[in-house]
Amino acid sequence: MRPMRIFLNDDRHVMAKHSVVYPTQEELEAVQNMVSHTERALKAVSDWIDQQEKDSGIEQENPEPEETETTEEGKDSEAKTGENPTRTLRGVMRVGLVAKGLLLKGDLDLELVLLCRDKPTISLLKRVADNLVLQFETVSEDKYEVVQNIREASIVIKNTKEPPLTLHIRLTSPLVREEVEKLSAGETLTVSDPPDVLDRHKCLAALASLRHAKWFQARANGLKSCVIVIRVLRDLCTRVPTWEPLRGWPLELLCEKAIGTANRPMGAGEALRRVLECLSSGILMPDGPGLYDPCEKDASDALEHLERQQREDITQSAQHALRLAAFGQLHKVLGMDPLPTKMPKKTKIEIPIIDYTVQIPPSTTYAMPALKRPIEEDGEDKSPSKKKKKIQKKDEKSEPPQAMNALMRLNQLKPGLQYKLISQTGPVHAPIFTMSVEVDDKTFEASGPSKKTAKLHVAVKVLQDMGLPTGIDEKEESVDESEEKPVLQTPSQTADSEQADSSAGDQSESGKQQGPILTRHGKNPVMELNEKRRGLKYELISETGGSHDKRFIMEVEVDGVKFQGNGSNKKVAKAYAALSALEKLFPDYTTYTEAPKKKRPPMMPRGGPKFAGKHNQGFGMMYNEVPPPQVMRGRGRGGMNRGRGRGRGGFGGGNYGGYMNSGGYGGGYGGNNYQTSATAGYSQFYSNGGASGNAGGGGAGSGGYSSYYQGEGYNAPTPPKPFVKKPPPPQQQQQPPPQHASNPPKPSYNQGYQGHQGGQQQQQPQQQQQQTYNQNQYSNYGPPQKQKGGYNQGTQGAASAGSYNYSNSYTGGTACRVRQWRGCRRARRPALTQRQALVTTQGRTPAMVQPAVPHRTKVTHSRTTIKVPPDRTTAALQIITSPLREEQEVMAGIQITT
């Protein structure tokens, strides 16, 4: 499994640090020589002691009660050693760094454990040490110094050359632990110990180190990256004093626990980060879970020797190291310089692969005991799927390595050949490359769907010319030929079948490079067979080959006949099986044509009753509850759905209420309202409490709501203006209504730019007309024109903060005039729905005006009913209705009701 990509940089740093701290080959050879020489010398000492005992006829007494009362653990330990229990020295075992393979550069202390039949004594230690000096002279030419350390119950051996190594041989016996267990169980000992017996605690520690070595070899050595991480952390414990108390057995247990509980193999960088996460979680803290020692019968904490302050310091240091690793600064934790992001390309140098797990080969002097009992495989526990996977793995291992292809063979025979691209033909999706190579003054050319395939075909030609094997698998060719035989059986299409057979043979040779497998009709065989026979099932018959070159055989049953196909994947195998079935069962089938599809009815306009058309109803800020009727598509600016002039529609176009009902945000494209003020579009909702001096905000005759809440007021809808290339005739100036002296007119936020109007836009005391972009913004950027009196430019004399803003109304002394568009064009006048507009009387009392709907084809002057609340006095009101070109003003009669 590939390591996770996010930890690749950490993996590089950890492996670089590991290569620095890993001992050199010379150091490992020196350790190997010293350990092997000592083991051979101890074997000779054991033989010498045995021979002396046999010659003298004196054997050490083994009391019968002691033999009969040995515990099961003692019997197991004797069985594990595999040595003769009658020998005084039963065997020597490697422990510590040597057995676990955790040696670092500069580690000079080595350990061995010498197992004795009885409890080791001082006399036995001296006897072994004295004879060991003599045996070293016969075993090796190297000089070794032997020192007796009775206090530590060990023999110390030192070499006399570089590097200066020190080897400790610790004497112990399984009887020491058996005696301790008896005492803890409350039993009395019937046999007294010799007076010169060695320290019991030292012997127990030697036995524990032996158990630790066996456990480590069984559990930690098999974990990926575990040994590497332990070596790196051992170096960290040496460099950082805070981590020093964790060095040794607790560190090994911790790393095995953190890495062994992962659900997948991890790289070195990810494994190190997982160990840091485990430490940062507080496993060392006094109230934490602790670290169980698996090599002890009684439950014991392997961290009991750590003090509280040491636990906190290590946890804090691990948390800091984890932060550095998270921010890409793992090199600071490892004590190294950061590596470059991109390594320079170097020529490959053959370097012998180093096995980082096993540093020193096992001993050949003594037969090493079995690390664990053999696994008892029970048929009930093993699932069939696991057995199948194991069988497949065994088959993959037993398969011979794949042979070289033609290109590899040719490169070995003729290194340094230059392949040239001659031409590239064919369409973009299926190119054909032609490559050439010159070998021995001969030029060979071949084609293929890719440059790599073309080079391979060229190599095949060269090898065939040289009379050498090309590396093509003949077995695959024979299988593919047998699959293509049904094509040859059709007598009516002999020539076509021969061509198909040759093309199929080419496809079988290089199926991966030839693209999809198709029938003679250019269809996928599986799809075409499914058109003939529905519900076919393809079964996987076999799966062979390694992970890099698998072969699948699929089978399909059609009309009681089974057809097989093979390929590099299941899809290709299914295609070949279907192709074989088609050629066998349907040799003369005609081209399949699909039935004409039924024409579907036209789609209804999107939306429900609330949104009758695509763009006839805006739904951004607010909308009408009753949808207006759908109108024919307009041709001018701001049409219903689309327009062909400037400003085509937008959201809601100009006929109905979209965003602000003037086409787009704040009078956008539909009504040509490119407003530039800070309150454009939404100013009528928020600026000045809903009342501004001008009826701006929504645009010229804007159909947007003039107040924030729906239903409190509505402006008369504005049909779009026709697109006319020549400038329109000047409009008649309208007399503004009289103003109150106490309320001067206020400037509008939406009056637009007036910089190009020249001197024709002078302010008049009696009439302050303010032109906005809402009537025709394009005229402002042309040459100076005559000022036009547009709609939505009057002022409100009676408006004040908090009152309503009526964008199309003029308020005056006792009368109020409402301007209303009558039509859009002469020939086509869009229908106006019945609306309700607000007008004001002299006392600023809201009254509802209900104009009648004008007809589409002719101008009518209808009556308008104004409803005034009964508690207010009524007054005669005049409504001035004007057509598009304002040729005349028509006065309509009004009826006032209470």
UniProtKB/Swiss-Prot annotation:
Motif mapping: Bipartite nuclear localization signal: 372-390
All copies of domain DZF, residue ranges: 5-379
GO CC annotation terms, alphabetical: cytoplasm; nucleus; precatalytic spliceosome; ribonucleoprotein complex
Low complexity compositional bias, start-end: 749-782
Listed Basic and acidic residues bias regions: 72-81, 374-384
Post-translational modification, as annotated: Phosphorylated. Phosphorylation affects nuclear translocation.
PROSITE patterns: DS_RBD (PS50137), DZF (PS51703)
UniProt GO molecular function: double-stranded RNA binding; mRNA 3'-UTR AU-rich region binding; mRNA 5'-UTR binding; sequence-specific DNA binding; single-stranded RNA binding; transcription cis-regulatory region binding
One protein family per Pfam: DZF_C
Compositional bias annotation for Polar residues: 489-513
Annotated Pro residues bias: 717-747
Keyword field: Antiviral defense, Cytoplasm, Developmental protein, DNA-binding, Methylation, Nucleus, Phosphoprotein, Repeat, RNA-binding, Transcription, Transcription regulation
Region feature Disordered, mapped onto this chain: 52-87, 374-403, 468-529, 627-651, 711-799
Biased segments, Gly residues type: 637-651
Ranges of Acidic residues composition bias in the record: 61-71, 474-483
Self-association state and partner proteins as the record states: A component of a ybx2/frgy2-containing mRNA-ribonucleoprotein (mRNP) complex. Also a component of the CCAAT box transcription factor (CBTF) complex.
PANTHER family given in the database record: INTERLEUKIN ENHANCER-BINDING FACTOR 3, ZINC FINGER RNA-BINDING PROTEIN
Protein name: Interleukin enhancer-binding factor 3-B
Gene (name only): ilf3-b
